[in-house]
């Protein structure tokens, strides 16, 4: 993994608490990825309702990956898992026997070239963790899943404030574009496709 990028992306417990408070004030559900057991314990103290497992944790190559997965599993809370770097889905399912799991199709490139998406593979997953630019990929994924008859379609998209300089800013969409994407997805969800 690119440790410099990862370190720049890390948030402190203090920042997590601030973000949780802002989310609570705006009726937005807060959850995030935990990369070590102490982070899970801290997120539990914030009373998060679900967890996100990043692709690199699924590979079990980070120093505390296995312990972190087991800590999240003990919470029995819903868990979103990005499979962008691979990982053994069957093994991960064994770790989480009592959690509602959402496995997301993902390619861990920032930004991701639209042409690299394998739609046939993507629709085999419960959700889509998207790193492409723009709104096309999430809209296509939602349409394909809706056509399959899926009712609960999960989309993960990195967003930023205008002029943000964060490490994933080049592959993130601003809040105006995000709002347009949500409106398009809601139209698809309320359409009859089959």
Where do the PLM segments sit?
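Catalytic cores and adjacent flexible loops of soluble metabolic enzymes
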Residues: 1-194
């Amino acid at each position: 993994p690119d440790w410099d990028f990862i370190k720049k992306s890390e948030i402190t417990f203090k920042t997590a608490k601030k973000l949780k408070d802002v989310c609570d004030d705006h009726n937005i559900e807060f959850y995030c990825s935990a990369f070590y057991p102490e982070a899970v314990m801290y997120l539990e103290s914030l009373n998060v309702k679900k967890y996100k497992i990043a692709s690199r944790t699924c590979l079990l190559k980070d120093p505390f990956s296995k312990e972190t997965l087991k800590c999240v599993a003990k919470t029995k809370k819903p868990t979103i898992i990005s499979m962008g770097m691979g990982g053994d889905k069957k093994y991960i399912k064994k770790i989480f026997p009592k959690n509602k799991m959402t496995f997301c199709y993902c390619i861990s490139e920032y930004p991701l070239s639209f042409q690299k998406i394998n739609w046939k593979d993507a629709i085999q997953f419960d959700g889509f963790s998207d790193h492409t630019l723009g709104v096309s990929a999430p809209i296509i994924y939602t349409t394909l899943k809706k056509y399959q008859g899926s009712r609960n379609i999960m989309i993960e998209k990195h967003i930023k404030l205008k002029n943000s300089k964060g490490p994933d800013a080049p592959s993130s969409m601003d809040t105006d574009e995000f709002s347009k994407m949500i409106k398009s997805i809601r139209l698809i969800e309320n359409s009859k496709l089959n």
